[in-house]
Amino acid sequence: MTRIKRGSIARRRRKKMRFFASSFRGAHSRLTRTITQQGIRALVSAHRDSDRQKREFRRLWITRLNAVIRDMGISYTYSKLIHDLYNNQLLLNRKILSQIAISNSKCLYMISNGILQI
């Protein structure tokens, strides 16, 4: 029996992983087994950190909003603002509200006053 090496399918799979790991350093970009292991590890880290990033940005937006609202001088907090926004069915999420708070805090002040008057 002659020796049969794996065909084009396995080569294609290894080539795809090698291209994915081409920016890795050392053996992680040269040896097939370590390329596979590091590729899996990189994807796991990317998935975990994308969830973490969403969490951290949401926390940042909430902190910014709360800081701007408390600086207004009204006895008004972030939680009351969000509660009143939902009760009045205003579709402004935390990201947009924090961008408004950073760029133009007077606009946020007008929004909160409008909610209080309703």
UniProtKB/Swiss-Prot annotation:
Transmembrane segments: none annotated. It is found in: Plastid. Keywords: Plastid, Ribonucleoprotein, Ribosomal protein, RNA-binding, rRNA-binding. One of its GO terms (molecular function) is rRNA binding. The keyword Glycosyltransferase does not apply. GO terms for cellular component: plastid; ribonucleoprotein complex; ribosome. It holds the Pfam family Ribosomal_L20. GO terms for biological process: translation. The keyword Kinase does not apply. Its main location: plastid. Binds directly to 23S ribosomal RNA and is necessary for the in vitro assembly process of the 50S ribosomal subunit. It is not involved in the protein synthesizing functions of that subunit. Belongs to the bacterial ribosomal protein bL20 family. This is Large ribosomal subunit protein bL20c. The gene is rpl20.
